[in-house]
Each structure stands twice: as structure tokens, then as C-alpha cells.
Amino acid sequence: MDRSQYLTVSELTKYLKMKFDRDPYLHTVYLTGELSNFRLRQKHQYFSLKDDNAVIDAVMFEHQFRKIKFTPEQGMKVCVVGHVSLYEKSGRYQIYIDRMEPDGLGSLYLAFEQLKKKLSAEGLFNLPKKQIPMFPKRIAVVTSIDGAVIRDINTTVRRRYPIAQVVLYPTVVQGDKAAADIARQINRANDRGDFDTLIIGRGGGSMEDLWPFNEEVVARAIANSKIPVISSVGHETDTTIADLVADQRAATPTAAAELATPVKLNDALMTLKDDQNRLLNTMRTKINFDRQQLNKQLQSYIFQQPTRLYENYAQKVDQLTQQLGQAAQNKMQELQMNVERLSGRLTAASPLHRVQQQEQLVDQLKKQLVTASLASQNEKKQQVTTLIKQLDSLSPLKIMSRGYTYVTSDEKVVNHASQLTVGQNVHLHFDDGEVQAEIKKVKEH
């Protein structure tokens, strides 16, 4: 047999994985199916996609799963995008998912309704609304540094109530990182503690553009704010989760500034910050240039798909973590059984236990001895009684009482007639006495 013709399982698996990874049709796969075996995990998600005739294993790593706006559920029909590869450890092919959205109903709309239902059940929309101060000294604004929102708010405040100070907390208002940044700036303004009113807002846009203001982290930051919050997000027809939680909603940034300030005052101070605006324009130009340079660097392959370098390792770490937890649990059970077994043996070998056993044995022997002694005494009494009866039945006196006598001559018992002679004196013994007689005649048989 030529063994060189045979492959090992590992070699065959590596070859098949290479075929999967090099197939351009499997690099980007668009797939629709029903979620099966889905159970929400803390980090990476492992589940299956199925239709009426087939099933495929699926993996979605933590950094990709966090980008999903809705909450996947068992049995939900979804559309996914990912790449297909072979997991060498199990020898099974699976799809590594990069994006997921519901099949049919839009993912953002579904996520909006899910969060709205959740927060409504918690009563977050029905909390007591804080009063907006009529004469604010300081107004915090959480919005983009280079959008029209801050310009409109500044213009309106200078026109209506120029003695109020507007403090900008610049934030990203669009993209994956925007929600966390908005919430962080709301918390920063609250930590400062000397603001009368807080305005959050951005201009109009699509539902995707306005989505950061529909995130739970922003809603909870607004609800927890000690400063009264005015929300101005999108156009008048747009309604976000932030609008529902805020103390007051404004249709536009200008309307938000009007709600935050009293009736119009002198417009004379509107030009006081021209120099500051020119400086800000210069800074914006520099920031935009640097942002363009950064985007060019981020377009490289290593930044586009860095996660593929460690996907298999991340899955293996999850499996090993699960095995370690199971092994620790088994070891604890084994140790507990050993402790219980040794405890039983120690109890059995205890001197106190043996003394108790011996005491019980002594008590049993005492009882047996008393029982045997009484039985022996009764038996001996019966034997003595029987012997007495036997002796009594054999006693000469007993016989003599029935009319018998015995004869003596010279104090010797006469047993035979041949021992006597005529004229010999003898004594006849009765049970109640004796008499003396003389032999008159001897007759032998």
C-alpha cells in the first residue's frame, strides 16, 4: 500500500478551506433565510439560517453585531451579507455575516418600533416634564460644530436675548459613533452643572441620517438629564425617540432657540463674534483636510477588513472558554463527591461510632444472658421437680404406706425366707412404726 496517496483529515480540511477562501463568488454572498437556533449571546453570535430544504451555520462577530439597529429573534426572516468559509475545527462550512436586516420590513423602522415599545413600557415617555427657564444665563447646545444648527441657534439667541451665553458641545450627529458621542456630550453638560437649558439637534435628513437620535443610549441620557432638554431633530414631520423623551420638542433649531429665550431684545450685539466665526472657519478647513487624509488611509485593505485576520481564532476562543467552564464544573462536582465519600468514611471510622456500636452489643449480650439464665433456672427447676417425683415414687416409705413392710434381724434386712429359722426373733417395719415377732414356720418356694 502506497501511503503517500493518502491525505490526513487536517490536510484535506485545509485544502477545502483554501478552495472556499479563493472562490471569488464566496467572498461576498447575499443570502436570505430564517433565523434558527438563535439565542442572544454577550459577544459573538452563533446560529443557523434555513429555508424549507436546507440549513447553513452562521457566525456574526461582536463588532459586526453591534452595528445592527434591530434585535434579531428566533424564526425571524432576514437578509444577510457575508462571506462563506470552512471552519477547520469542525470541518463544516459556514457564512460569516457582515450585515443583517429584516426581510421585508425595514431594519431601521423595526428597530425604532422595538425601542419605542420598550421605553414606553418602562414609562420613559411619561416622566414629568421639566420647566424651561424663561431667562437663561447659559444655554448648552449639543450638535455638530460645522452644521447650520449652531449658526441658527446663535443667531436667534443674539437677536432675542444677547446676554445669554451659548456653549457648544460639539458632537458627531451622523454615523455609527454618533449616538455614543451625543450621549457623552449631554452627560458632560450635566456634569458642568451651571446650564439653565440644553438644546440637542441637527438638520433634516433621511431616517438613516437621523438614526443616532433614535438610539437607546441617547434616550436614556436625555431622560437622566438634570437640565431641561429641548429636542430639535430633522424637519417638523420627523419624530425621533429623542423628541419623545425630551422635555420639549421644537420643529427647527431656530424654534428651539426661541423656546429657550424670552421675547426679542435689541439686535445690536449680533456681530460681536465675527472674529470667532472666522477662526472657526479656518479650523473647519484644517479639520476637513485632515479628515480627507485619514479617509484615504482607512481605504486600505487592512483597515477595510481587519477582522478576517482573527475570525477563526475568536470562534476557537469561544469554544475553549465554554469547554473550560464545563471542565471546571465537572471538577467541582468530582471534588464534592470525594468530600462526601471521605466524610462517610470518617464517620464510620470514628471511635465514638465504634464505642456506640460496642455499647449496643453489650446491651444485647446482657439481655441474652438474662434470658438464658432465666431459661436455665426454669429448666433446672423442672428437672429437680421431676427427680423429686421419681425419688418419691421409689421411696420405701412410699411403698410401705401402701401396706408393705420389710423385715430385719439383728438390724440387717432379711431379703429371703431362707435367711430365717423357726423361733428366730425379727422386727417388722411399718411406715408408722415397727413390731417384734417370732418365726413359727419357714416355708420356701
Curated annotation (Swiss-Prot):
It is found in: Cytoplasm. GO terms for molecular function: exodeoxyribonuclease VII activity; nucleic acid binding. The keyword Hydrolase applies. It holds the Pfam family tRNA_anti_2. One of its GO terms (biological process) is DNA catabolic process. GO terms for cellular component: cytoplasm; exodeoxyribonuclease VII complex. The keyword NAD does not apply. Its EC number is 3.1.11.6. It catalyses: Exonucleolytic cleavage in either 5'- to 3'- or 3'- to 5'-direction to yield nucleoside 5'-phosphates. It is an enzyme of class 3 (hydrolase). Keywords: Cytoplasm, Exonuclease, Hydrolase, Nuclease. HAMAP family: Exonuc_7_L (MF_00378). Heterooligomer composed of large and small subunits. Belongs to the XseA family. Bidirectionally degrades single-stranded DNA into large acid-insoluble oligonucleotides, which are then degraded further into small acid-soluble oligonucleotides. This is Exodeoxyribonuclease 7 large subunit. It comes from Limosilactobacillus reuteri (strain DSM 20016) (Lactobacillus reuteri). The gene is xseA.
